[in-house]
C-alpha cells in the first residue's frame, strides 16, 4: 500500500517557496511606477509617453532581455575553436 505521507512530492527536493506578491509601495520608493492601463497611455501626449515608458516595468520576455553583445571573433580564433 502506498504511504501518502512519504510521497515524492513531500520531498525537500520538490518543495519550492512560493513567490511573494509584489508590494507596489517598494516600486514607488525606487521611483518606478506600476504599469498603467492602455486607456491611460492613449490619452497622454506623444513626447510625454516616451518618458513614461522608460519608467514603467515591461513584461519579461527573451526579446527584451538585454544580453551582452558577442565580441568580434577573428577567423584565426574561430578556426582554433573548431
Swiss-Prot record:
Keywords: Cytoplasm, Cytoskeleton, Nucleus, Ubl conjugation. A motif (Nuclear export signal) lies at residues 24-32. One of its GO terms (biological process) is positive regulation of mitochondrial depolarization. Its main location: nucleus. Signal peptide: none annotated. It comes from the Eukaryota. It is found in: Nucleus; Cytoplasm; Cytoplasm, Cytoskeleton, Microtubule organizing center, Centrosome. The keyword Ubl conjugation applies. GO terms for cellular component: centrosome; cytosol; nucleoplasm. Cofactor for the transcription factor TCF7. May be involved in lymphoid development. This is Protein AF1q. The gene is mllt11.
Amino acid at each position: 500500500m502506498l504511504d501518502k505521507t512519504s510521497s515524492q512530492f513531500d520531498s525537500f527536493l520538490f518543495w519550492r517557496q512560493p513567490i511573494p506578491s509584489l508590494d507596489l509601495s517598494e516600486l514607488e520608493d525606487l521611483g518606478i511606477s506600476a504599469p498603467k492601463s492602455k486607456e491611460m497611455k492613449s490619452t497622454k501626449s506623444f513626447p510625454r509617453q516616451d518618458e513614461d515608458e522608460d519608467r514603467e516595468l515591461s513584461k519579461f520576455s527573451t526579446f527584451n532581455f538585454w544580453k551582452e553583445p558577442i565580441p568580434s571573433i577573428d577567423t584565426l580564433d574561430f578556426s582554433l575553436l573548431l
